[in-house]
Amino acid sequence: METQITVKVKLKFQSSETAPNFTKTMELYRQACNFVSDYVFNHDFEFKQSHLNKALYADIREKFKLKSQMAQSVIRNVVARYKTVRTQMARKPCRYQDTNTGEWYSESRDLTWLRKPINFNRPQVDLQRGRDWSYRKDGILTINTIHGRAKVVPICHGFNQYFDGTWKFGMAKLLKSGNKWYLHISATKEALDFDKQQVKHVVGIDRGLRFLATTFDEKDKTAFFDGKAVMRKRAKYQKLRAELQSKGTKSAKRRLKKLSGRENRWMTDVNHQLSKTLVDKYGANTLFVLENLDGVSFERTDLPKTLRNQNKSWAFYQLEQFLTYKAHLNNSEVVEVSAQYTSQRCPKCGVIKKDNRNHALHEYHCENCGYTSNDDRIGAMNIQELGKMYISGTERPKFEKLTTNA
């Protein structure tokens, strides 16, 4: 099994010509991406590399002066972006309400829903190891530009640990943030295949807002990771964002862009810390179980207005990504299970009833057997139960609705 991570390296220049060369190369690469994107959009989303090469390669080389490998990279990058958008659209179907009956319906979406080609706004360059970038024995990174290779010094704590022979490097992405330059390098490492027979811990994880995560394990131990501080900070960001949007000035738009980057970096750090805490707590041979949230709506009218936006923008998927790669590096696994009925099912008697959950009190009370507990804990308990079913051999465990035993 391969584990993939992204190594983020800050770059220090040795020549005053490096920054302008990087800037020019990135801008031409961006323009080439938009050129290819227009073609893909207007040709029924053609993704075959051979067809796109035949139609566009010569034009990319001539119009944008990109080297051979960069021209190929442009095509791959555009195709990858469209495929990512296709996946995102499939995960979030269109929901609409029938004005006559009041019932809600879902309709799956695909790329034909796009009204215009995907636009590449941010200048960047995708670089292939060897031909476009390399790391020398003297600690210098060399990066290809339209004016030849540039030499830069990598600044990254623990960067040398990835050169112990166990990691393989692939594509790298050249980026600029403010006045600082970065290289994001894709690295993969072979990890031991996860063995269900060696599992020591099965941990159900319910993700949310009030609690970032609620966990329940095989020892019946529950842990709550408080999200109130995160909610307050996100509400603060939302207030600042609304104030800047109401101004509409150029300076306000610049501040909005910086604010968005700051919020994303902060939230990324929160998810990194939380995923690290979970992996460190349980160690190797742990199965972390998450509910599959594809197509799940988070429209919550019971939340205050200030928190509804947070609910929509919550980075559940990012937390899952971080937890997955950290678990793989620690000989553990993350599995998704069906979210159906996990918040409605009594973990003691198995009866499923929506009204047993009280959102206002954050409580679950089973009318059948009388079991009562925190509603987030109930979710984690049910998710953990599905994890045990997975370990026992059920490939896609889910709950079937039962009526009361009475």
PLM features per residue range, with description:
Residues 1-406:
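Nucleic-acid substrate recognition interfaces
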